[in-house]
Amino acid sequence: MYTAKERSFDKPCGNFGDWEIFNKIVEVSDQAREIVRVITQEHDLPFSIVGPFVPDNPVAKSLPPFAFKNSTKAGTMDLLMNAGPLHDEIARLARENNFAVVGSSANRSLTGSKFVFEDIEAQVRDVADITIDYGLVPYHNDKGLGSSIIDLVSYETIRVGCVYDQICDIIKDGFDIDLKAITAAKG
């Protein structure tokens, strides 16, 4: 996958998650936990978070060494939640079977997300063990943006995603945290 995507090993992959996996595996403040709940449950938005995790959780322990190394960084992991019905079902199955599922977008790195199967580069499709033509995916956009990724400890924006402005507004209005100002200050 890394070769086909031309992806750096310095860039960790994301883990499939849902509210229950998040609560069992990610160690963050009560405020950060409430932010995730509000965004994913009250506003029904996709959200990727980065936060410290419990390494001896059965889901985390299910990762083989290579996958563990490439889906965690400095004691943190990226967990994608609420990314549509197919994603949510895979996350549910992962949780019920205590089996982590690690993923990366179906595109060459840094070329933008692909929203229909036909747009995925052949070099990426050709290395997949299974492919699913899901039709036009939720949250498709002209900029090729995937999910927003927010560090739940520093509240720094790691990646601006398709519903970033909505997420910023929700967090600023409900929690008085200005993600854009925090990220700008970190330069």
Regions found by a protein language model. Give the residues of each.
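Active-site-adjacent structural elements in enzyme catalytic cores
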Residues: M1-G187
